[in-house]
A protein has these predicted regions:
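Juxtamembrane non-transmembrane "cap" segments at the membrane-aqueous interface
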Residues: 2-17, 157-170
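Hydrophobic membrane-targeting segments
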Residues: 8-72
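Alpha-helical membrane-interface segments at transmembrane helix boundaries
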Residues: 28-38, 123-144, 175-187
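Residue-level signature of catalytic and energy-coupling elements of molecular machines
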Residues: 35, 53, 89, 104, ...
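Residue-level signal for the membrane-embedded core of alpha-helical transmembrane segments
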Residues: 41-51, 144-150, 154-157, 189, ...
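Predominantly long cytosolic amphipathic alpha-helical stalk/bundle segments
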Residues: 61, 66-153, 157-171, 201-232
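Hydrophobic alpha-helical transmembrane segments of polytopic membrane proteins
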Residues: 183-202
């Protein structure tokens, strides 16, 4: 009986020696193991993410600058208009670098024209200013839509490669190799979704900022047109 009991630990040790150590793969290893196709997809997504972040900061800086208002600007314009000093009003507009000053300058250039002409000139300049602020926003929207599709394309390519390896292996299917290929394929979808979400949020954030500036421009131009109407 003692001999039997002594043999039990030996069998336990032999079983524990058969336990396979769990293997883990880092994200970098998964990406780098995707082959040329997977690396191209992930490289493309990386470039798109950099481009999206660049547009976010560059456009935010431009829009923020356009939204800054000088409280004394319209007051000075009002004083010049009331004093019939049109040249001084033009000079002030030229020396002030913001959308509202350029729009009002267009109106002052047509100060002797009918109000409809003045309003049309201001509106046309306003459209140009909005176009400047919205520059590259369409590209950001494109990144938001294209990145997930590019990531999904990488997944499809990865799955095709994985199943091709299964077919080539015949009956000798390596489950570890197959699982690794599927993991790698799914990484491109995750990458595409991350880039797409970042670009989508950035796009809507910038659009909301542009809308706020447009509201400011409309309010200031209305004040200017009312001023001209009262001084006719």
């Amino acid at each position: 009986m003692n001999i039997i009991f002594l043999q039990i630990p030996l069998k336990t040790d032999s079983i524990s020696s058969l336990i396979v150590e769990e293997k883990t793969l880092s994200v970098i290893e998964l990406i780098s193991s995707g082959g040329i196709g997977g690396n191209i997809i992930m490289g493309t997504l990386a470039l798109l993410s950099i481009y999206a972040i660049y547009i976010l900061f560059e456009r935010y800086s431009t829009i923020k600058k356009a939204s800054l208002e000088d409280e004394s600007f319209l007051k000075s314009i009002k004083n010049f208009i009331e004093q019939k000093d049109i040249q001084a009003a033009k000079t002030l507009c030229k020396n002030t670098d913001n959308p509202i000053s350029r729009m009002i300058e267009k109106g002052i250039d047509r100060i002797d024209k009918p109000m409809t002409d003045i309003s049309a000139a201001i509106e046309n300049q306003g459209k140009l200013e909005v176009y400047k602020m919205e520059n590259n926003l369409a590209n950001l929207a494109t990144v938001a839509g294209a990145a997930p599709m590019i990531g999904f394309l990488g997944t499809v390519i990865g799955m095709i490669v994985a199943f091709h390896e299964m077919a080539s292996a015949g009956g000798n299917i390596d489950v570890e190799m197959l699982s690794k290929g599927i993991y790698t394929a799914m990484v491109t979808t995750v990458g595409g979704l991350i880039v797409g979400i970042i670009a989508y949020i950035a796009y809507n954030f910038l659009v909301s900022k542009v809308d706020k500036v447009i509201f400011q421009l409309e309010a200031r131009t209305t004040e200017f047109l009312d001023l001209l109407h009262h001084n006719e």
